[in-house]
A protein has these predicted regions:
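Solvent-exposed serine/threonine-rich low-complexity stretches and specific carbohydrate-binding patches
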Residues: 110-121
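C-terminal motif of bacterial Sec signal peptides marking the signal peptidase cleavage site
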Residues: 9-12
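Short, surface-exposed beta-strand/strand-loop-strand elements in extracellular ectodomains
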Residues: 97-112
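Short, well-structured beta-strand segments within conserved domains
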Residues: 83-89, 106, 124-128, 133-152
Length: 170
């Protein structure tokens, strides 16, 4: 019995070890430490207000924030081989019942970058490769997310959509 156990234990042992090189390393997106904001923000971040240029409700509702007619964010975009703009947003049932389908115009640094039509309420994820000629590398960049329609809130406030997170990813 001992010889059977010993045979099983040594069966996988071999004298030849295969060697594999480590995967290619590249630096992660890095930012100057003096900036109050970076290349991506979640609305749950206590520092989310530093990214907001305008067009948002003043207070956050926890992990998300209401937008108004022309929400604008600012990001510091470091040099990277390839970046995508990512936006997680929600069109709540209550406001969508007033607006119907919404067309969102996305502007990068003041230039129209894309138009997207959202035909149903609920959570949505927008992502698109961002050509370097649209960005200012190692500098502050603005992203405007303009809905073509807004809904009237209970106090008359114009509500666009709910933003959860946005920014640039590799």
């Amino acid at each position: 019995m001992f010889s059977i156990v010993l045979a099983f234990l040594t069966a996988g042992c071999g004298s030849r070890l295969e060697w594999y090189p480590p995967p290619e390393q590249r630096p992660s997106l890095s930012l100057p430490s003096s900036l109050p904001f970076g290349y991506f923000v979640a609305m749950s971040d206590p520092n989310a207000g530093a990214y907001i240029v305008g067009g948002f409700r003043d207070q956050s509702e926890g992990v998300w924030r209401w937008t108004h007619e022309r929400p604008v964010l600012q990001f510091y975009v470091p040099r990277a081989p390839r970046l995508r703009l990512l936006v997680d947003l929600t069109f709540p049932d209550q406001t969508f019942a007033q607006t119907g389908p919404v067309e969102l115009t996305i502007r990068l640094n003041g230039k129209e970058f894309d138009r997207v039509r959202y035909a149903k309420p609920g959570s949505q994820e927008y992502t698109k490769d961002t050509p370097w000629e649209w960005l200012h590398p190692d500098a502050v960049n603005t992203v405007a997310l303009e809905p073509d329609k807004t809904a009237a809130g209970p106090d008359g406030e114009r509500l666009g959509f709910v933003l959860t997170r946005a920014g640039f990813v590799e």
